[in-house]
């Protein structure tokens, strides 16, 4: 049966109502419709609601400027589909899978997959307890990431989520050589542009596909771009049998776009103005990000926390789907500790003796205990000063401060801003360094020698340069 043709009934911003003849074959929900503008360009709409009497309410994937009532609208007969496969590596796409870099157009016969798909069946799932080494000390020691797991980077505005994601892409591509898919959802175009050229310069881009739906795009594009990136990642997992890294920056913007679309469709909002379907939409996305018997998708998602409020429904809904959380804390940036990861609020289901080993688990637990005790003593220190502490407490505070500074390190991707070379620290070296600090081996060394260094040997070198003689 031929696909039906309708006409624009009304345009309200990014929402377009399309009237089809009532006796026609009406398009299904999530089908893509196309409008050919007067200049020959095409606008894609996605069916969101059926209003009755043959009228379908749709969301535009691009600007609706220049549309008029009565313009012809074609049903494509299926959902939005995007190119997948090895030809997507090294390229940058928009929500519709059109290349937006300066490369060649893809072959028209190239394989395309629908962005709306079911999550893998229960019997196809595979659970892994293998650690993914990142080379970032605070992560590898205290909240190790699982291969095939879901990780959330939580933080307010300007605490370093995007820089941390860039460093993870750099380290994992350099050390593990895996395929990465980076999805920019509602973030700054400048950051995406910088990331693209940085990755091209470092040679990482040839194993990476990038998909962008940035801040200036209509809410429909920002809502669907995460699914476009996920569809590209799923192909490498299911068909090529690869282990894929999926970076999403920022998952909050996915929720925010869904909230805008929901309001435009006339749904009654729920708590704090979010869409009533928030948990469903998040579940449909997150359940597709998983490991199967063929391959794995490890996802690292930046999550903006509005006004640093972790009880907000958007970050709270995301929490339920994660294996590990990395919380970025503003007070640590104020102390000049980067990455500003809160070692006590961050967590991982992988931090168990069975997965990381006895020694790693013991050192990580001791680090957390020392930092927790230091946090408890800070009130006494701020009111009465260090003199009121017992000798044992003074030792705990001194070691905790050295541990806290040693959790910081320079990033490779920040080298051009800081002028300091970045460091990649293997897990064994990280565990060894913290074990020696906790044993008191470096109690006499100046605190500043522990700031922004990689391995423990660098502390000794830095202390010597500062004129310290052990």
UniProtKB/Swiss-Prot annotation:
Superkingdom of the source species: Bacteria
Entry annotated with the keyword Transmembrane: no
Binding site for ATP: 155-162
Keywords linked to the UniProt accession: ATP synthesis, ATP-binding, Cell membrane, CF(1), Hydrogen ion transport, Ion transport, Membrane, Nucleotide-binding, Translocase, Transport
Any one annotated GO CC term: plasma membrane
Record carries keyword Ion transport: yes
Main location: membrane
InterPro entries, per database record: AAA+_ATPase, ATP-synt_VA_C, ATP_synth_F1_bsu, ATPase_a/bsu_AS, ATPase_alpha/beta_chains, ATPase_F1/V1/A1_a/bsu_N, ATPase_F1/V1/A1_a/bsu_N_sf, ATPase_F1/V1/A1_a/bsu_nucl-bd
Enzyme Commission number(s) of this protein: 7.1.2.2
Compartments it resides in: Cell membrane
Membrane topology, from the record: Peripheral membrane protein
Annotated catalysed reactions: ATP + H2O + 4 H(+)(in) = ADP + phosphate + 5 H(+)(out)
SMART domains registered for this protein in UniProt: AAA (SM00382)
MF annotations from Gene Ontology: ATP binding; ATP hydrolysis activity; proton-transporting ATP synthase activity, rotational mechanism
Subunit structure: F-type ATPases have 2 components, CF(1) - the catalytic core - and CF(0) - the membrane proton channel. CF(1) has five subunits: alpha(3), beta(3), gamma(1), delta(1), epsilon(1). CF(0) has three main subunits: a(1), b(2) and c(9-12). The alpha and beta chains form an alternating ring which encloses part of the gamma chain. CF(1) is attached to CF(0) by a central stalk formed by the gamma and epsilon chains, while a peripheral stalk is formed by the delta and b chains.
Family indicated by similarity: Belongs to the ATPase alpha/beta chains family.
Function: Produces ATP from ADP in the presence of a proton gradient across the membrane. The catalytic sites are hosted primarily by the beta subunits.
Protein's name according to its UniProt entry: ATP synthase subunit beta
Taxonomic source organism: Lacticaseibacillus casei (Lactobacillus casei)
Gene behind the chain: atpD
